[in-house]
Each structure stands twice: as structure tokens, then as C-alpha cells.
Regions:
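Conserved glycine-rich cofactor-binding loop
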Residues: 8, 15-16
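Alpha-helical segment proximal to the catalytic Tyr-Lys
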Residues: 129, 173-174
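Active-site loop immediately N-terminal to the catalytic Tyr-X3-Lys motif
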Residues: 102, 149-156, 177-178
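Conserved glycine-rich Rossmann-like NAD(P)H-binding loop of the short-chain dehydrogenase/reductase
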Residues: 29-46
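Active-site helix of classical SDR
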Residues: 124, 160, 168
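Residue(s) in the substrate-gating loop at a strand-loop-helix junction
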Residues: 144
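Substrate-binding pocket helix/loop in short-chain dehydrogenase/reductase
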Residues: 100-101, 108-113, 203
Length: 205
């Protein structure tokens, strides 16, 4: 299957979990990939080279920090400069912290909003001009069931995911006439390193 041959997908938070699954799915459809995320260098290289070997596409890794707008712009530019286009952007990076609201650390709030919400804005802002130039683009934002409902002790995460839903709708209206779509996916629990830390031992049994 090579429906996306010649196209480039930039996927944030893609060195493990849902993001890596996105990246491998797009590679399986023929797209070149810009991976992004943290991890041990050897582990990242294993995933990067594995994508190239398994799917016969090109794959590079951007270490862009999702709290830094300039680095996010550089990540998008890496796709354009390396592969000639940025056709697909997946905003998937995310972190979590659980605490009662009165004890919620300010720095944790700021970090979650920056990574889970603001990074998507910065990525979209950087990618849309490339997509408009080509007259085609796909933007996918990973929201959550928490973009639809609330959950106690997750004030920042729930606020960010509700924000992702609103951002998605707004961008979709703005870019539709340019043959660019913007959608979000709202999964529930998916067994990833992020979620595993949240599941009580009683639920694992």
C-alpha cells in the first residue's frame, strides 16, 4: 500500500505508544516520517531505522522540545527541508499529572498546557503555510475522552484536551477551502507508558 507515497508526515510524541503507531501506519502507506519525542538514543534509533527497514521509506528524528515554539517550527522545517513537503501533521505529544486542584503544582499546570495544547497550536501555525502552498494537507490532533468529559484530579489535562477540541474545530473552519482537513481523535485508555502509570494495581489484576 503506497497511497501516501511522496508525502511527509510529522508526528509529535512518536517515539513510543500511540505516536509511534501513527508513524508506522503512515509509513506503511508510503509516507516519509519525521519522528519526535524523548527516550534513550539507542531506543529512538531502533524505532527510526525500523521504520525505514520495515516500510522502505525515509525517517528522521527531531528532538524538538514541545515547550519551545522555535524548536517546533524547526521540526516542521526539517520535514520540508529533508523531504520537500509537510503534508500531514499529527499533534500527539502529551504528559499527565494527577493532583487535587488545591495542591496542583503551578509548574505542572504550565507544562501540561504547553505540551498538550500549545504545542499543537505552534505546530499547526508552522505547517499550514506549507500545506496551503501545495493545496493539500491533513492535520490530526490526539485529543482524549477527556476532551468530552471531565475527571477529578486532572485539571490541566482535561483543560488541555478540551482546548484541543476547540482548536481543531477552529482550524478546520479556517483551512477547509485550501483542501486541508483538521480533525481530532479522542481515545479512551490505551495501554501506553503514559497511561500505565495511572492505572491502579487493582485494575491491572
Amino acid at each position: 500500500m503506497a497511497k501516501l507515497s511522496g508525502k511527509t508526515a510529522v508526528v509529535t510524541g512518536s517515539t513510543s505508544g500511540i505516536g509511534l503507531a501513527y508513524a508506522r501506519a503512515f509509513a506503511g502507506a508510503g509516507a516519509n516520517i519525521v519522528l519526535n519525542g524523548m527516550g534513550a538514543p539507542a531506543d529512538i534509533e531502533k524505532e527510526r531505522s525500523g521504520i525505514e527497514t520495515d516500510f522502505k521509506v525515509k525517517c528522521v528524528h527531531s528532538p524538538a522540545d514541545m515547550t519551545k515554539p522555535a524548536e517546533i517550527a524547526e521540526m516542521v522545517a526539517l520535514g520540508e527541508n529533508t523531504f520537500g513537503s509537510v503534508d500531514i501533521l499529527v499533534n500527539n505529544a502529551g504528559i499527565q499529572f494527577v493532583s487535587p486542584i488545591e495542591d496542583f503544582p503551578i509548574e505542572k499546570w504550565d507544562a501540561i498546557i504547553a505540551i498538550n495544547l500549545s504545542s499543537a497550536f505552534h505546530g499547526i501555525r508552522a505547517a499550514v503555510p506549507h500545506m496551503k502552498k501545495k493545496g493539500w494537507g491533513r492535520i490530526i490532533n490526539t485529543a482524549s475522552a477527556h476532551s468530552l468529559v471531565a475527571s477529578p484530579f486532572k485539571a490541566a489535562y482535561v483543560a488541555a484536551k478540551h482546548g484541543i477540541a476547540g482548536l481543531t474545530k477552529t482550524v478546520a473552519l479556517e483551512v477547509a477551502t485550501n483542501k486541508i482537513t483538521c480533525n481530532c481523535i479522542s481515545p479512551g485508555y490505551v495501554w501506553t507508558p503514559l497511561v500505565e502509570k495511572q492505572i491502579p494495581d487493582t485494575m491491572k489484576a
